[in-house]
């Protein structure tokens, strides 16, 4: 698990906001991080939308 901070634009559809902290897994292809939003749904975030904490 990787701890990261979301620094992208707030996404109300995905229920995530700038400054949210997540524990994430790296996707199989290594191009994005997989996090769970407040509803438990998988959200895929690109590497330029997050900072490793």
Regions found by a protein language model. Name each.
Residues 50-53:
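Short hydrophobic/aromatic patches at helix-to-coil boundaries
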Residues 2-48:
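Basic/aromatic-rich interaction segments and small domains that mediate binding to polyanionic partners
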């Amino acid at each position: 698990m990787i701890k990261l901070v979301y620094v992208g634009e707030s996404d109300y559809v995905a229920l995530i906001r700038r400054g949210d902290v997540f524990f994430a897994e790296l996707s199989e292809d290594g191009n994005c991080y997989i996090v769970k939003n407040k509803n438990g749904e998988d959200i895929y975030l690109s590497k330029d939308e997050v900072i490793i904490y």
